């Protein structure tokens, strides 16, 4: 009798088959349908100790599942039960053999792919129980895989993407229209299971393993997440997003899950379709799952991946028509907040690029929604570290100009202005607002005069400046309040706020535009924020010519911006306070700030030829030392003249222009009363005097359309009202009486109307304001008395210079004030005096004799900040800047020609362009040798260690050989070589002091020749 051959199964197959219950017990294994626990432990132990057998186990499972899936869809319940057990076995193998998943990854994905195709018999719907177990196995795979096979193994990659596609299709399934009785719970369960699978892929290493395949994966993952997000109500979105912020769990619906970390410590969740008696999931659960999956994906992205996700968001919105603006803005804000901090800037930047790529046509929902999304992001509490503020501003300004050229009243312009204004909400560096205003001013200056839309472009960009200040000021207040630095609002009696006119003095005159104060509650200090620097007056000066634009809408818009600047940005000056003992002439003076080294008279005008010969005690105080931007000459663009023929009546000043000027002057005298008095008093005298001489209309001269007589009367009203404000602020009764008499001599009603109240809440861009013309004067001739000033200028000056309050504030005697106020005033001279005399590094005065002596004295001081003075071919210190130049690592962007200014360069004053920056660095020869530079640096360092400390005595070389050496500590107020006096120095020594040297505007220094 022969032997029967032994046909036993392979051990791995035997262990696998042993995990299943007997065929007769399969139907009774429900509802859990679990493998036999003891045999499953043997299988996992065997596979763990013999990883080489995993491939065979995977192949055997694949064969079984392929057969079971087909039979289960045909209605065979035994095969369906066996399929559920097979998927449980697969998940157990994935969990226990996590280190060797790659050995059976291909079979695993094929098993999952086959299981997702199972349908309920005769109904055709998705079998949620089978799909749930397949999703659990897929999540286990994505949790423990390193993703190295995705993108490398074509078969595996194709199967992986097919699984994602099926999950994406199930995540957007809609069962509400497929039957007469919609099953919302069934739809929500289906979507939740599919979203769980997509969440596993979104949090897996596989999505980031291949740079080439990352876009393909997010093409399958992002749209289903966005569909479920946008189907939720806005209230649900806000609630679920808030929960995500409070709950750090990355899982969409379970908490026992660790997304990252070592593979051995990761945990894969179990999923279930439904538990009998359990209430079905709601739409809020689906929205929460979608948001959490999106949150988990975005948290792991770098800048390139985040940009690609934003592109998919834009593509999704393009497909759905950008119809949900509120949800669009909310999603954009949340996406920005969930991206890592250093990459958040990509969202607004990419959205602005989308706007720039759109064609100039009638605004579409895409225009409005994309712009609203950018504005929402900029206004949100989310910080955008690394945001290129200037680059973003340039794109937005270019878009504004394009839209204005397309349509002067384009509906997108208000939103664009609001978007630009939002750049002031968050501060990322101290000079951010300065740079924004300067960039807007430069863009205004670049507009060609031939541009037909020039006026409207300027008006809109000016509204952008105002909007930036409004948003910045509001953000500053919010930041201060959050820090507990609440500033009490001052009452009108607080110093620095307007005082009711004629309080307790004379009977109130006729009603004037000053009856209501300029600022109802003026702050004692405008800029208090520690987040940023205030807008520099040097930056703002570039915009001042807009007050003289020929178009009234531009003038009125800029006037409001200027008043806002004075209210919120201009630093408060010393406020005079009258004392009863002095009859209203006392003052509270601030200690003048002095700086070491050279002093420039940049805060006062040049009243005449004797300005440089002021005596001791009547000189100007030096402004506090600070890093300031250079002044550039800014003469008016279109100076308003009394032309014989005008294209429009608003080409010259209108009543509302005078009202704006009155408000601006009043604001100046409240914000910086001392500086306003010094610069404004000579102007008021000159304007009153010139109005009678220049604005004269004679019979038949054809100047009726220039409103000559009306403007002259308005000027005199303005001058009288401002003098009355000055008298009230400084407590000078004589000037107050004189101003009131002048006002009483003018016929009523006054030509200057009250200034229009600004909109509340502020409107970032409104329609252009319409000008109002004067009422035509019927007289054809004038008497000779009208050519004289309305106010007695001698009486005004006498009362002004004798005021103890003014003398104490300026620290000048009566004679010094007389010379200060009684000088010849002109627009050109005033602009010259508003600029720096010369930059210490770049410019030199025309008078070399004084300059050489001054430079020699300066170089003997301990003042290293005064660079490279071109006097007696003096040597200068070699520093690291020279080494950087020699190495070629320094890019010098400073040009002596300067950037284009708003100013008109037609005037002879502008024939010489000013330097762009007063701090232009010294330049070395491009051929300088690095070794030589290093030698010079160490040579200077050795000399510096041997130099004596303390007071440095140096003999000033000049034409006179008998001139004595002078001792300097660097504390002098000026460098004049005549009229010097001796005083006590910082160490008690007698040192030379002298009045300020009024150096004229210099010319550029040839640094290369001097060095």
Swiss-Prot record:
Compositionally biased intervals (Pro residues): 489-501
Q: Which InterPro entries match?
A: ARM-type_fold (IPR016024), EFR3 (IPR039786), EFR3_HEAT-like_rpt (IPR049150)
For the region Disordered, what residue ranges are annotated?
A: 478-510, 571-636, 891-927, 955-1011
Gene Ontology biological-process entries:
protein localization to plasma membrane
Comp. bias (Polar residues): 576-592, 609-625, 910-922
Q: Which SUPFAM superfamilies match?
A: ARM repeat (SSF48371)
Q: Which family does it belong to?
A: Belongs to the EFR3 family.
Q: In its UniProt entry, what is this protein called?
A: Protein EFR3
- Give me the gene this protein comes from: EFR3
